[in-house]
Structures are given as structure tokens and as C-alpha cells.
Amino acid sequence: MKGTMEDILILCIGDSNLIGDSLGPLIGSFMYRKVIEDNPSVKVIGTLENPIGYNDLIRITEHLNKRKQEYTTIITIDSALGSSQNIGKIIMDNSTLCAGNGVNSGQELISDISIRGIVGKNYEDAK
């Protein structure tokens, strides 16, 4: 990662009320507690208490577009659907994250690193 710990934004996406979509908020809550303990200047957005659901993504995207220069590293974390053999795996890319593909409505988010936990099968791939 480039920059220092003060320049990192961790964006954890998902709905804490939906089991299959709660990976982001679960990790966000854990990271928030850990980051506040170890380095309060790292920003974590999206927790079980304050989740970032699909309906929030346009607002978050606008925020990131305006304030991208404040962060040298943006990490996005979300649950995702994938092939049967990838369920339970974590996929990490040096690229943007396209959230909402599981509901056939993707929203691309600015990020340097995207982390997706495959939580279920994407039945669209089987067609």
C-alpha cells in the first residue's frame, strides 16, 4: 500500500439485516474497534450499527469522487456471489469494486484494493 496509515479509508459495504450481505458490516465493526484502538486516524465506514447498503452507494460514490485526494489508499470490502467452487473464498484485487451485482444492479466504487467474500452461488452464471 502506498502512503501512511493516516491516509487509508476502509469502506465496508452491505446490509446488516441480510445474512448473505452482512460480511462488509461485520468486518467493518471489527475493523472499527481495532482501528480506533491502534490508529484512530484510519477511517472505517460501514459497520453493523451504521451499514452502507446499496441505496447509499450513489451518495458514497459522490463523496469519494469529491474527496479522493484525502486518501492515498481506499479499500472496499463486500460480500459477493460467485461460482460454486469459490464459495467461502476471499478474492482481493487491485481495482475498483462493483457492488450490487448480486441484485443485477452494479455500482462501481472508487478503490485501490477491493476485497470480496464469496458467500453464495451466482445463479446467473449457470444460465
What kind of feature is each model-predicted range?
Residues 1-74, 79-126:
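N-terminal catalytic or cofactor-binding beta/alpha core of small enzyme domains
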